[in-house]
Curated annotation (Swiss-Prot):
Methylcob(III)alamin binds at H107. Pfam families: B12-binding (PF02310), B12-binding_2 (PF02607). The keyword Repeat applies. The gene is mttC1. Can form a complex with MttB. Disulfide bonds: none annotated. Pathway: One-carbon metabolism; methanogenesis from trimethylamine. It comes from the Archaea. This is Trimethylamine corrinoid protein 1. Keywords: Cobalt, Metal-binding, Methanogenesis, Repeat. Residues 94-216 form the B12-binding domain. InterPro entries: Cbl-bd_cap, Cobalamin-bd, Cobalamin-bd_sf, Corrinoid_p, Met_Synthase/Corrinoid, Meth_synthase_dom.
Amino acid sequence: MANKEEIIAKAKDAITDFDDELAAEVAAEALAAGVDPVELIEKGFTAGMQEVGEQFEQGTLFLPHVLAAAEAMNAGIEVIKPEMEKRKSQTKSLGTIVIGTIEGDIHSIGKDIVASMLNIAGFKVVDLGRDVPIKTFVEKAKEIKPQIIASSALMTTTMVNQIQIEEQLKEAGIRGQVKTMVGGAPVTQDWADKIGADIYGESATDVVSKVKAALL
């Protein structure tokens, strides 16, 4: 049986090779070998995603590559998720986060990964899915009073709708009761600042650390 370092290295390779079958196999192997799932995700899967992201920024990889890598990571996380849920049930929730892909955008892979990472980190995540109407974010905020409303956009044509979340939360009189987080491929810190969002999530691991800093 491979040791921990070898398993983690294979997990990273599965992402950079866009191999969802290998990612699932490595995740199962890690569980059987007693590798900490969080360590596997952070040092294996997420490290692979960061490498793909860097190549995307350099222009050596393109959006379909990023999506394929994200699909591979999701395949691995799906295998690990039952174990993480078991652990999570034994610990106190760190807070509630409502997350969804913004109205007009049908892409959900990045959002799914962020939701999984937040779940693993100990937050209760209410996933609204993709192509979520602005009013649904606001209604859910009123209903369950989460600590954070998070929206993802993968296209410049849809990220403008993130402004509407800010505006409609204000109109509903609850903007001061909840923090907002924005993320997605075209989203930047400048954009988050411009629309008044509290948190900009650049990557899955970045999101977890920023959310903890904002709430804890």
